Design a protein with these regions (language model features):
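Juxta-kinase regulatory segment immediately upstream of eukaryotic protein kinase catalytic domains
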Residues: 1-44
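Conserved ATP-binding subdomain of kinase catalytic cores across diverse folds
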Residues: 27-138, 167
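Conserved protein kinase catalytic core
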Residues: 66, 141, 199
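Short helix/strand-bridging catalytic loops that position acidic/His residues to coordinate divalent metals
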Residues: 74-79, 145-150, 195-201
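Conserved kinase catalytic-core helix
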Residues: 91-112, 140-184
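Hydrophobic "anchor" residues on beta-strands that sit immediately upstream
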Residues: 131, 170, 189
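Catalytic activation segment of kinase domains across protein kinase-like and atypical kinase folds
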Residues: 174, 178-201
Length: 201
C-alpha cells in the first residue's frame, strides 16, 4: 500500500511485475486490471511513448530522452514508490482530489481531469521499466490550438488555471504547451504529464 495525500495506491506483485491502482476503485477494476496483463494489446511495443489502446485509454511508456537516451527505457530501481509510473499516478490522484474538493466553480467546470487507471512496473535486478494507463483526453495540444486560433481568450483561461495550480501548491517542472490539452467541443482544458510535479498543498 502506497500512501498519497488523499488516499492510497494498492500494489500487486507477480514474479517481477507490479500492478498498482487507486484503492478506491479496487472492487470495480481489480479483475479487469489483472486480466490486462495477459492481453496482446498491452504487450504492444511502444515506439512513440504514447499508445492509443482504442478503448478510451492511453498507455504511456516511460523512456529516457536527451543525454540519458542510451539507457532507453531502463531506470534504476530505488523502491516501487520511487518509480516514475507510481510517482505520476500519485500526482494525478492528488491533483484530482484538489480539483474535486475546490470551491472554485469556474475551475472545476473548466478542467477536464485525466484519470490514472493503473500503473505497471517490471523489475529486472537493479533496473525497471514502466507504463501508466490513463483515461483518454480528447482535443489538441495548446501549441496547435494557438496556431489555429480556435479560441480568442484561451490565454486568459490558461492563466487562470495556472493561478489555481499555484494557489494549491501544484508545481509542474516540465510544463509546456504540449502538456496542456484544449477540447473545442467541450471548451475544457486538461493538464497531462504529471511525472515531474510537486504538490505542497
Amino acid at each position: 500500500m502506497i500512501k498519497t495525500k488523499f488516499g492510497s495506491i494498492v500494489s500487486h506483485k507477480f514474479n517481477n511485475q507490479y500492478i498498482c491502482y487507486d484503492s478506491s476503485i479496487q472492487p470495480i477494476l481489480k479483475d479487469r486490471i489483472l486480466a490486462s496483463l495477459d492481453s496482446d494489446e498491452f504487450r504492444l511495443s511502444n515506439t512513440s511513448n504514447f499508445l492509443d489502446l482504442n478503448n478510451g485509454l492511453i498507455k504511456k511508456h516511460f523512456c529516457r530522452k536527451g543525454a540519458m537516451h542510451l539507457f532507453n527505457d531502463n531506470y534504476f530501481y530505488y523502491g516501487l514508490k520511487n518509480t516514475r509510473p507510481i510517482r505520476e499516478q500519485k500526482n494525478h490522484m492528488d491533483f484530482m482530489n484538489i480539483v474535486k474538493n475546490s470551491k472554485n466553480e469556474w475551475v472545476t467546470s473548466k478542467l477536464e481531469l485525466c484519470m490514472p487507471i493503473f500503473s505497471y512496473v517490471i523489475r529486472s535486478n537493479l533496473f525497471y521499466k514502466g507504463d501508466i494507463i490513463l483515461s483518454k483526453i480528447t482535443g489538441e495540444t495548446l501549441d496547435k490550438t494557438l496556431m489555429k486560433r480556435l479560441k480568442i481568450n484561451i490565454e486568459e483561461e490558461v492563466g487562470l488555471c495556472f493561478r489555481f495550480l499555484f494557489d494549491n501548491g501544484v508545481y509542474n517542472f516540465d510544463m509546456n504547451l504540449t502538456n496542456i490539452i484544449y477540447n473545442p467541443e467541450s471548451d475544457k482544458l486538461s493538464f497531462i504529464d504529471f511525472d515531474k510535479v510537486t504538490i505542497n498543498s
